[in-house]
């Protein structure tokens, strides 16, 4: 799709699988709120566990914000096979006055590439020139939110899927998987229950945050796109990628929030995108902000095509 083959693609996202490809390829996407787009996999051998349902979302990818918005409207239609689908309007009330955007303050322990800092500043400037009010603000406990995501998803996979996955996959996959596991706590039943309870605490904190700042501007990845085999180098490298580079991606899944990714710039020939995160079922606010950035940054794939010509 980024190369011009097809106009709209369909993906899903439980830890970044819509937003990370969009970032790497210079296209637009939105991970909708959990329950916005119905999902049903008729070929699945068994139902997914509850938290996998609550952290996963189906969504569109396209070359422009307008195409993503149109695709989301089509994909959001009711399907009775998904008991988690929610009938909520795609457009909500506009916040009063200029919309306040929180430019997420990056944690002190994050290794952030200067090109990402520059892209975030450019996106913030684009929003301000479009009438938004942007302030750098610390978002609620991004480290704790990410750890809750990691603990829940890794432990669910270990219990229900790990043996089957390892039996049919390569040593490279085993390296990548063990790198992901390295950052997770091993949970017994009481630990898993505490982790799922913590999810509600985190969501409440973010919902209160959105009362003051309806949109959050955050990085997709804080480091340049890695090489094609970076996830096979070592389990330590994989663990670092998930914790450092992609922390702001996966944390949003456990919150169930809508998050759009829009490309901002090229750095050494590679696209850099940013996330626009909004409150539950406020995909419209995230996409409006993404459209404001796109209006000034342009449709990035056109620059990529010129570069490749």
What are these regions (language model features)?
Residues 1-72, 253-266, 270-273:
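Short glycine/serine-rich loop segments
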Residues 95-104, 152-207, 223, 258-270:
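Short helix-loop capping/hinge segments that flank enzyme active sites or metal/cofactor-binding pockets
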Residues 205-208, 239-262:
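Small-aliphatic-rich amphipathic alpha-helix that forms the alpha element of a beta-alpha
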Residues 194, 225-246:
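Short, surface-exposed loop/helix-turn segments at secondary-structure junctions
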């Amino acid at each position: 799709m980024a190369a011009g083959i097809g106009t709209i693609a369909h993906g899903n996202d439980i830890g970044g699988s819509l937003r990370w490809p969009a970032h790497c390829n210079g296209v637009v996407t939105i991970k909708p709120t959990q329950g916005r787009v119905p999902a049903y996999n008729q070929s699945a051998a068994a139902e997914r566990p509850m938290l996998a349902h609550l952290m996963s979302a189906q969504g569109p990818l396209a070359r422009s914000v307008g195409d993503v918005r149109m695709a989301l409207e089509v994909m959001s239609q009711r399907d009775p096979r998904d008991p988690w689908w929610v009938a909520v309007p795609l457009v909500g009330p506009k916040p009063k006055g200029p919309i306040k955007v929180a430019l997420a303050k990056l944690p002190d322990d994050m290794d952030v590439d200067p090109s990402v800092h520059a892209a975030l500043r450019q996106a913030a400037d684009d929003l301000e020139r479009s009438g938004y009010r942007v302030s750098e603000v610390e978002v609620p406990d991004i480290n704790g939110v990410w750890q809750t995501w990691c603990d829940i998803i890794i432990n669910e996979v270990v219990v229900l899927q790990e043996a089957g996955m390892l039996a049919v996959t390569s040593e490279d996959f085993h390296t990548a998987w063990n790198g992901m596991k390295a950052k997770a706590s091993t949970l017994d039943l009481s630990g898993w229950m505490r982790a799922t309870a913590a999810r509600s605490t985190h969501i409440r904190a973010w919902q209160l945050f959105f009362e003051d700042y309806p949109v959050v501007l955050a990085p997709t990845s804080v480091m340049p796109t890695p090489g094609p085999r970076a996830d096979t180098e070592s389990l330590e490298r994989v663990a670092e990628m998930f914790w450092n580079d992609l922390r702001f991606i996966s944390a949003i899944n456990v919150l169930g929030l809508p998050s759009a990714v829009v490309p901002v710039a090229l750095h050494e020939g590679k696209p850099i995108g940013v996330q626009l995160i909004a409150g539950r079922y406020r995909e419209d606010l995230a996409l409006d902000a993404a459209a404001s950035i796109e209006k000034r940054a342009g449709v990035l794939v056109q620059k990529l095509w010129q570069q490749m010509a």
